[in-house]
Amino acid sequence: MQQPPGGAVGLVYGPNGYWIAERNSVLSYPAEGNDLCYSLEDDSFWFRHRNELIVETLRQFPPPGTLFDVGGGNGYVATGLERAGFPTVLVEPGRSGAENACRRGLRTVVNATTDEAGFAPDSLDAIGLFDVLEHIPDDLAFLQSLHSLMRPGGRIYLTVPAFQMLWSSEDDYAGHQRRYRRATLAKVLKRAGFDVEYLTYCFWFLPLPVFLLRSVPSWLGWRKKPNQRSATNEHSTRGGFAGWLVNRALSWERSRVTRRQILWMGNSCLAVAQKRPHAG
């Protein structure tokens, strides 16, 4: 008989090959969001580069054991981490995301929130929150709850959207509660009991185009609800000189993260924090 991951007591093994919650919650995320992302993740420069930065960050700050990718959507990040040699459990409350993750071949998928799963206190070695925290109404309480689930010395890895001035209709549609600065993310992590080990901005070249092409049109009421076509256009890389410039910019940024350097501007924040080990 299979044992649920993380000592979870609120899960049952479903007929579709993944763990499911015995009860379900309401999500701050559009019902079709996972399917929209699934259709463009593999061809998106943004998702690909974020994965590369996450993998590099885990190499610099290795997890002490299995990483639980909380709110991990379709398993794009979890699949990349597994391929890079980091054992990963996907924890995704959306049914479509869990099913898409299974299609990607992930071995351990949990269709539940962390509360629904009932993970045991001090049981998780590492947690990933990749563009998840901005969806949570009370981010401090959520981080504190995750802190209680982690073993001393465990690490949490995060990405979040940056700068409230870059707010647009995409944030509204995605169910975001806020965007962060380095200082605000560091503050909430510390208040939750974590020691921040690394915190940088990333996608350093995107704030200006996002401001001009998303934020301003949204303020003026010109920006429409994102759809498959608009999302594909924004996430695809162009050929020629423009594509070369984007790839150079991404490569430069990746090299800085590999050396643990801090970037002072970007459309996202990338962070690593640790639950303080027991003294002695």
Regions found by a protein language model. Give the residues of each.
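Conserved N-terminal segment of class I S-adenosyl-L-methionine
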Residues: 1-122, 126-130, 140-143, 240, ...
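A structural helix-start
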Residues: 136-140, 160
